[in-house]
Amino acid sequence: MSETSGEKLNIEYKQEYVSDIKKEVIAFANAEGGTVFVGICNDGAVKGVDDPDEVMLRIVNSLKDAIAPDVMPFVRVDSVAIEGRNVIEIQITTGTNRPYYLREKGLKPGGVYVRKGSSSQPMTEEGIREMLLQNSGRSFELCRSMTQELT
């Protein structure tokens, strides 16, 4: 696997486990999905992790505790060998209960993230409203107007 050529729209590298991984997972679940690699530097250099089981446990517990609604059905966390080193691969698919957000921040900018280019950005209030409408199966265009004339 030689995906280590730098971050892309659907790939994020983290040299080590840091708590902002939650933001990356939220951003991918709210967008088109993606993969976060822990143990790879931003430039693609493979560093690896010392204790993959402990890192995976920390990641899973962090995601379960910090993200609402539950994102875990759309996340897979594995230990993989890249260039002979243990790296954690977090695969995220697009969630069905979007928008996902940080519990402590709530359903507002600063709590909701989306992937834009090769970075995760806070969503605007307008973007959050749009996503809520899309996810509820309703869009503005499909809402019935009380003054609409039927032909």
Where are these regions (language model features)?
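Conserved N-terminal catalytic/coupling substructures associated with nucleotide/phosphate chemistry
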Residues: 1-151
